[in-house]
Design a protein with these regions (language model features):
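Canonical alpha-helical transmembrane segment with a positive-inside/aromatic-interface signature
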Residues: 1-51
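Extracellular Ig-like/FN3 beta-sandwich strand-entry sites
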Residues: 95-99
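Generic structural motif
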Residues: 6-11, 27, 42-44, 64, ...
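Intrinsically disordered, low-complexity polar regions and short flexible loop motifs
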Residues: 101-103
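Noncatalytic linker/hinge segments flanking ATPase motor cores
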Residues: 46-48, 62-67, 80-82, 140-149
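Acidic, serine/threonine- and proline-rich intrinsically disordered appendage/tail regions
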Residues: 110-157
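Extended, solvent-exposed segments with strong compositional bias
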Residues: 53-94, 106-113
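Short, surface-exposed linear segments at secondary-structure transitions and domain or protein termini
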Residues: 43-46, 60-72, 121-135
Length: 157
């Protein structure tokens, strides 16, 4: 599997809403089944005694599991009032050493085994006010093609 290099805060849903999103592509020759994603945000803070601590927050996903994963999936955390990204500015979260941990689990039917992938995005890899460029095109025969080298390309808004 290949992950986008960055995770973006992008327009999402209604005009005033935003989502935290990254892309993942299946680089295998086989279709993966029952693919699930989990995101956890972790930040540092100083407690009342001056001791450094870590906070962990599970990030809700628009879709946490897809039954069939043939090519590309944009995983989206809708930023609602419960999200750490709504409660703190991106600058604040970067100061608190935010890291978004990503865990993917899937089933490779061809080999009959579980497939796991993981990555993380640190503060400097979180891009605010941006959106991903299109990675799929229709070829001359009208078939949908995916350029996996462009899954992480984005534009600032």
């Amino acid at each position: 599997m290949k992950f986008s290099e960055n995770i973006l805060i992008s327009p999402y849903g209604k005009s005033t809403e935003k989502g935290l999103m990254f892309r993942i592509t299946n680089r295998r020759d086989t279709t993966l089944l029952e693919t699930s994603a989990q995101l956890i945000a972790t930040t540092s803070y100083q407690d009342k005694n001056g001791k450094m601590k870590r906070d962990f927050a599970r990030l809700n996903l628009e879709i946490s599991e897809i039954k069939m994963f043939p090519s590309l999936w944009t995983v989206v955390h809708p930023i609602d009032e419960e999200s750490i990204f709504a409660k703190h500015s991106l600058e604040e979260l970067i100061k608190r050493n935010i890291e978004v941990l990503v865990m993917i689990k899937s089933h490779d039917e061809s080999y009959g085994r579980a497939v796991y992938a993981r990555t993380s995005y640190k503060g400097d890899e979180i891009i605010g006010n941006a959106k991903f460029k299109t990675s799929s095109l229709l070829n001359a025969e009208g078939e949908l093609t995916l350029d996996i080298d462009t899954i992480g390309k984005f534009v600032k808004l």
